[in-house]
Amino acid sequence: MASAGKPALDDSRRGTGSPKIKARENAKDTLCRNITIYGRCRYEDKGCAFNHDPHKVNSSYQSDSKKRFNVDSPSFTPSLLSSNGSSPTSTPATTKKMTTISPKAANAAPFQPRSVVSRSNASTPGLRQDTVTPDWTVAEVQEFVPQGFDNSHLATLQGNGNGPITSTSPFDPFVTTSTPLSAGGAVGPVQPNPYSHDTAAALGGAAFFPGAAGFQQPVQYHLYAPIGPHSQNTLGYQRNVHDLFLPNDFREELQKKAAATLQTLPNTQLPAQIDYFHSLVPLDLNHQKNATIFGFPSWVYKAQSSKDGNFYALRRLEGFRLTNEKAIRSVQAWKRVCNGSVVTVHDAFTSRSFQDSSLIFVTDYHPLSKTLAEQHLGAGQQRFQGRQNVHIPEQILWGYMTQIANALKAIHSNGLAARVIDASKILLTGKNRIRLNACAIMDVVQFDSQRTVTDLQRQDLVNFGQLIVTLGANSPTVMHNPTKAMEHFTRAYSPQLKNSVFWLLNGMQKDQDRNIDIFITGISSQLMSTFDSALHLDDQLTSDLSRELENGRLVRLMTKLNFVNERPEYEHDRQWSENGERYFLKIFRDYVFHQVDVQGDPVVDLGHVISCLNKLDAGTEEKITLISRDEQSCFIVSYKELKKALESSFQALMKPARRMH
């Protein structure tokens, strides 16, 4: 049986084998490839059937092209035209065949190219020239002119400094306008917009070449540009860690403030709730009672509001009894004071939650803030005890003075007086950033005071000057001897600062008008320096914020990948089965997150994940190799194709018809 079947197998192979190569009929007119490649053919005298003369081939090609494209060739005439109803001897079959040509087609004029009329001197179209006409040229071909082209746009398209463009230029289909193109001009090349998502639409060709159905490119939020000004003079190839992330100290500061805001105190003896506030946490570092400033012991707590969920600072005056209801209403005027150098007052009320009669003031909470006394006075005494005190730099003192002057300007403009300008009640909320605190308390505690507002405002100026002298001497008790304090201040600082402080200390004198506006006019040069520093800080914060712009884009990409991959409800749906683009999206997920090393251990590389997702987000042309889990399929795709597949799959998932399944 085996021997019998073998000839049949040979016959089948012989029957399906390649046929014998026959000699080409036009081989003599075809140039030998060896002549083209090597310049000679060693088989020329050994039976090579191809032509070995290049000049002969070119001449034959030109003659052939003249035969095919000669415009003076005889006009086309239908073969049945001569016998259409004119031959009496035509057979019935021929007559039936001739009836298929309509009389209008039979009487049509013979075809003649339009260019013959323009190049012929004869008066009749049927007369031909005996001279040899040249071949066709591109300029003689009638150009295609679309309807709806605007000639007014030629100036903008040709405005490249090269002069007008002749009509022999080819038509550019990527420009659309509203009126027909004039005969005297054509369209020049248009530079594409590299930032446009739809290139055809950007060049104006959407009307002629409608784009294929696909996903719509999202906003280019991955195109980041460094926002100036740039304070560091680095070379183009040099990089700093601050170019990629927030400055480390700034990030740590924000994280610490967030942790301090959310801090709780378990097993506390404090009340669980005070009015509409709960979760009280004490903020005082000194647990000794001190009634020097307000006349009552005061305590500060952090609490969360049940109304809006925000955190506030509660200042409690222990043992205060409200005798006049109008006193607490004076806080309403302080609610209208909105200034960056004043801690905003929100509310004031009495409470017995601490088992006594207490007065509670509600103000803004600034986490991890210090007082000027803690920053400069207390730290100076502990650290430099027995040494010469270190003076605060003069520029920092000027910054403090301009901010306090700004606060007093807002307070005095509302017909109020701060009344409390003390180093222990001024908060340092940032780098050289201070705010006046506890200003409204004295208006309630000393409501029955007979002093006028003008007198209290003058006293604010005196307290202001004493504060600067205290900070300059770096000692809280220096004002017990004012003469010695000013001598010490004069030796350490400039005459301008000394004269400004001396003017403030004499604020109670009646010899001349003294108010905060006059003081601000006197320190206007320092105000400009502080304002310039604030502008630099604003630029720095804007630059830092720009690096965090759209920092959730990688999360969106991972969310889309998980939405598309391995959906169990569409497992048997042919339109949604994991084939095609959805299949290599699944493999791409393994490529990003499920890689293993040579030993088969999982590779946990955050840099690889971020790099792949960034390239996917940008849609780069870089190609990667994706291999299936069974190692039977291999794909070579680019990130651009992956991005398009992801967007189209996600858009298909969002269709209403898909959601109805």
UniProtKB/Swiss-Prot annotation:
Localization terms from the record: Cytoplasm
Pfam families found in the cross-reference section: Pan3_PK
Segments of skewed composition (Polar residues): 115-130
Zinc finger (C3H1-type): 26-55
Residues the record lists as binding ATP: R315, D364, Y365, H366, P367, L368, S369, K370, T371, S424, K425
Signal peptide positions on this chain: none
An individual GO BP term: mRNA processing
Region (Pseudokinase domain): 263-524
Domain comment quoted from the record: The N-terminal zinc finger binds to poly(A) RNA. Contains a pseudokinase domain. The protein kinase domain is predicted to be catalytically inactive because some of the residues important for catalytic activity are substituted and it lacks the equivalent of the binding site for a peptide substrate. However, it has retained an ATP-binding site and ATP-binding is required for mRNA degradation, stimulating the activity of the pan2 nuclease in vitro.
Function: Regulatory subunit of the poly(A)-nuclease (PAN) deadenylation complex, one of two cytoplasmic mRNA deadenylases involved in mRNA turnover. PAN specifically shortens poly(A) tails of RNA and the activity is stimulated by poly(A)-binding protein pab1. PAN deadenylation is followed by rapid degradation of the shortened mRNA tails by the CCR4-NOT complex. Deadenylated mRNAs are then degraded by two alternative mechanisms, namely exosome-mediated 3'-5' exonucleolytic degradation, or deadenylation-dependent mRNA decaping and subsequent 5'-3' exonucleolytic degradation by xrn1.
PANTHER family on file: DEADENYLATION COMPLEX SUBUNIT PAN3, PAN2-PAN3 DEADENYLATION COMPLEX SUBUNIT PAN3
Protein name as catalogued: PAN2-PAN3 deadenylation complex subunit PAN3
